[in-house]
């Protein structure tokens, strides 16, 4: 740290102000000139607060500025709670107990009110704003402050300005108004600590790893000897891919793979209502839908369109309506709920035999043979559902996200703008709808599993969203909507281990007839009619359509609960991928090219009629999100094995692209390993087909390592 700034600060600032400023600069890695700026601001805040009492004799002002960020946030939240105020999304400097308002203090050397206007644009009238200038001007959005406060503060600022001018430091601390602000980056303590923690083993610190990498020199002879040694140990000949080309992956044949996600996606139909903040619990939402929407009138017909156990599902549906009507959300144990919930149907262990009893025969100890899953072919329905997930839904704001913290500098403003741009594209997609459904529904199931493990409970399959802007101006737009997709019954759930399973029975609404190949696992009933709103010209008309009830018994594990309830993480991976591309392009050009990159850079998203389809990065975001979410919902051992092996082919493809030689020990064995993972997972089969298409396209463009059958 430069001693010049610290020494000057110590000559005219209070010791406490200097200490606070030094700690802030060291913690956040700011420029040394900030010592004087922060110190002056803190001392002005102290002058604003000191020696002023409320009518009851206690201190009128509470000083928030100068505390550690965590402590300051806690204090501000406590004050909001104590005085029944709305929590603020940003930190203020002071709290006025007498007027029950927060106060923001600003200090500027500008001759106009631009600094005040920028603060007012961010904060509005949510708090008092006082901006003091070195030339004696005060900009504010309310009455005050007291005359004595103003005199003390202006006197101090004038003294500070004179002192800094004598030391020729006034212009050093503040950049001239006609120059652009320079963003100077410095590594703070937290950054350095996280950087050292992230280095791979065997390195202990970043500097150690950096030193090793800088001194490392590749030795071709040494590398060749290591390869030869590895070859002699494995006793397999090295095969260069130019002579031993990769063939296409053979997809399994047979019936199409069925739909295996826990909830319907493209076929799902939802009932909507305006959200009531006072009735936001899952059970209350379900009661309101059945009461106001008359959903109790839904009655499945006796004969299903397809599926097994229709009597059990019909009786359980009647029990669900009774549980909602009496507001208990609990279903009593009976033959139907126990059968569908799998209660008492677990395989029994072989009984222990005491020494005094006869020994049981070897035949009695034999375990039934495990049946391997039947191989399934690529499902035609998957492509249609993939494209549906990419498109926009009627509503937006499906995934609940935390509010952005207040930006403290231009770099954070820039990052916030980029994230809001990407989030605006993603939040209105059908994929975001399904993510929101998983987050809230599985979150409610997790709560019921923890609180009522021994009970059979009713939980809504629901999500929350916001309406898009009305097509006709002047119509009121509800801020938030509750969307009900169906009802889920949780069976008994004693989850002692992470892989512990529990049964759920889902009843989901749809206005589409079932696809026998896709919905093999469902029992489907006709259940009456519903009204669909359709836009015809400038008016909206209602049309009655049949309503179907899709019923299914499936299971969830403790681990799957965690994955689905945290599906919003798919946003992070997606946005991080695109952000990296944008920042890399900007770094190359040494200018802000974010908007240009989002709108002009193309990404391959698929193939149609034998030709590649590419879209701008802004729209390709959707494909990235769908891919991440599908990894989340279809994840199993097949998908993990496939992804682990396919990357070796992709590495060879990248090497071919860079005109480098690639080799391995057993290319045919690698393909066989991949094909072992292709059984009945729809996502695996989809990715294998995409990989084949990628290989075909690469071969057309001159790739040397692949051959087309």
UniProtKB/Swiss-Prot annotation:
Modifications after synthesis and translation: Phosphorylated on serines and threonines by host kinases, including human casein kinase II.
Entry's Gene Ontology molecular function annotations: endonuclease activity; metal ion binding; RNA binding
UniProt motif Nuclear localization signal 2 (NLS2): location: 166-228
Major subcellular site: host cell
Keyword Transport set for record: no
UniProt cofactor note: Binds 2 manganese ions per subunit.
Residue window of motif Nuclear localization signal 1 (NLS1): 109-124
Keyword Metal-binding belongs to the record: yes
Required cofactor(s): Mn(2+)
UniProt cross-references to InterPro entries, sorted A to Z: INFV_PA, PA/PA-X, PA/PA-X_sf
GO cellular component: host cell cytoplasm; host cell nucleus
UniProt-annotated binding residues for Mn(2+) 1: 41, 93, 104-105
GO biological-process terms attached to the record: cap snatching; DNA-templated transcription; symbiont-mediated suppression of host gene expression; symbiont-mediated suppression of host mRNA transcription via inhibition of RNA polymerase II activity; viral RNA genome replication; viral translational frameshifting
Pfam families per UniProt: Flu_PA (PF00603)
Protein's cellular compartments: Host cytoplasm; Host nucleus
Documented EC number(s): 3.1.-.-
Residues given in the record as Mn(2+) 2 binding sites: 65, 93
Keywords in alphabetical order: Cap snatching, Endonuclease, Eukaryotic host gene expression shutoff by virus, Eukaryotic host transcription shutoff by virus, Host cytoplasm, Host gene expression shutoff by virus, Host nucleus, Host-virus interaction, Hydrolase, Inhibition of host RNA polymerase II by virus, Manganese, Metal-binding, Nuclease, Phosphoprotein
Family matches, as Gene3D superfamilies: Influenza RNA-dependent RNA polymerase subunit PA, endonuclease domain
Subunit structure: Influenza RNA polymerase is composed of three subunits: PB1, PB2 and PA. Interacts (via C-terminus) with PB1 (via N-terminus).
Family from the record: Belongs to the influenza viruses PA family.
Main function: Plays an essential role in viral RNA transcription and replication by forming the heterotrimeric polymerase complex together with PB1 and PB2 subunits. The complex transcribes viral mRNAs by using a unique mechanism called cap-snatching. It consists in the hijacking and cleavage of host capped pre-mRNAs. These short capped RNAs are then used as primers for viral mRNAs. The PB2 subunit is responsible for the binding of the 5' cap of cellular pre-mRNAs which are subsequently cleaved after 10-13 nucleotides by the PA subunit that carries the endonuclease activity.
Cited HAMAP family: INFV_PA (MF_04063)
Protein name (record): Polymerase acidic protein
């Amino acid at each position: 740290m430069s001693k010049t700034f610290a020494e000057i600060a110590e000559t005219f600032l209070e010791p406490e102000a200097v200490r606070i400023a030094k700690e802030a600069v060291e913690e956040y890695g700011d420029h040394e000139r900030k010592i004087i700026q922060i110190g002056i601001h803190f001392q002005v805040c102290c002058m604003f607060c000191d020696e002023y009492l409320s009518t009851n004799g206690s201190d009128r002002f509470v000083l928030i500025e100068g505390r550690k960020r965590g402590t300051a946030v806690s204090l501000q939240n406590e004050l909001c709670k104590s005085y029944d105020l709305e929590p603020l999304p940003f930190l203020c400097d002071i709290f006025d107990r007498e007027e029950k308002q927060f106060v923001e203090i600003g200090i500027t050397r500008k001759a106009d009110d631009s600094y005040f206007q920028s603060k007012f644009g961010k904060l509005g009238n949510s708090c008092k704003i006082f901006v003091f200038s070195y030339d004696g001007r005060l900009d504010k959005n309310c009455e005050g402050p007291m005359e004595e406060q103003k005199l003390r503060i202006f006197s101090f600022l004038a003294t500070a300005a004179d002192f800094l001018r004598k030391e020729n430091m006034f212009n050093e601390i503040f950049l001239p108004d006609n120059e652009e602000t320079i963003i100077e980056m410095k590594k703070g303590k937290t950054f350095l600590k996280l950087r050292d923690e992230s280095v791979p083993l065997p390195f202990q610190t970043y500097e150690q790893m950096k030193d090793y990498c800088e001194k490392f020199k590749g030795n071709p002879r040494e590398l060749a000897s290591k390869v030869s040694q590895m070859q002699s140990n494995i006793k397999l000949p090295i095969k260069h891919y130019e002579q031993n080309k990769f063939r296409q992956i053979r997809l399994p044949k047979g019936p199409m793979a069925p739909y295996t996600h826990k909830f319907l996606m493209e076929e799902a139909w939802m009932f909507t209502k305006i959200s009531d903040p006072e009735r936001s619990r899952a059970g209350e939402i379900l009661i309101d839908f059945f009461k106001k929407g008359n959903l109790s009138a839904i009655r499945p017909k006796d004969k299903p369109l397809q599926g097994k156990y229709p009597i059990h599902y019909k009786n359980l549906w009647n029990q669900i309506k009774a549980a909602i009507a009496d507001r208990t959300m609990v279903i009593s144990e009976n033959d139907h709920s126990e059968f569908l919930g799998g209660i008492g149907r677990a395989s029994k262990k072989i009984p222990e035999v005491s020494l005094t009893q006869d020994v049981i025969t070897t035949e009695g100890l034999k375990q039934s043979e495990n049946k391997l899953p039947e191989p399934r072919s690529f499902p035609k329905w998957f492509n249609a559902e993939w494209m549906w997930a990419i498109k926009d839904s009627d509503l937006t704001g499906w995934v609940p996200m935390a509010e952005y913290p207040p930006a403290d500098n231009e770099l954070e403003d820039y990052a916030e703008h980029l994230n809001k741009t990407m989030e605006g594209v993603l939040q209105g997609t059908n994929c975001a709808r399904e993510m929101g459904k998983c987050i809230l529904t599985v979150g409610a199931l997790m709560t019921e599993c923890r609180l009522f493990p021994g009970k059979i409970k009713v939980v809504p399959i629901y999500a929350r969203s916001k309406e898009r802007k009305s097509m006709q101006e002047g119509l009121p737009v509800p801020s938030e909507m509750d969307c009900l997709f169906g009802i889920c019954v949780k069976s008994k759930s004693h989850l002692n281990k992470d892989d512990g399973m529990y049964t759920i029975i889902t009843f989901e609404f749809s206005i589409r007839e079932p696809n026998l190949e896709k919905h093999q696992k469902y029992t489907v009933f006709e259940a009456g009619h519903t009204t669909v709103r359709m836009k015809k010209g400038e008016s909206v008309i209602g049309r009655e359509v049949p309503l179907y009830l899709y019923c299914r018994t499936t299971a969830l594990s403790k681990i799957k609960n965690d994955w689905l309830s945290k599906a919003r993480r798919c946003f992070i991976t997606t946005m991080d991928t695109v952000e990296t591309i944008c920042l890399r392009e900007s770094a190359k050009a040494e200018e802000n090219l974010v908007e240009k990159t989002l709108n002009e850079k193309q990404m391959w998203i698929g193939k149609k009629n034998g030709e590649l389809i590419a879209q701008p990065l802004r729209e390709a975001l959707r494909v990235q999100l769908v891919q991440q979410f599908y990894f989340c919902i279809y994840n199993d051992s097949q998908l993990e094995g496939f992804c682990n092996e396919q990357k070796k082919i992709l590495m060879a493809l990248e090497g071919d692209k860079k005109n480098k030689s690639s080799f391995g020990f057993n290319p045919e064995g690698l393909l066989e390993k991949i094909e072992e993972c292709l059984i009945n997972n729809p996502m695996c089969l989809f990715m294998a087909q995409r990989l084949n298409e990628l290989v075909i396209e690469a071969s057309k463009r001159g790739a040397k390592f692949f051959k087309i059958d």
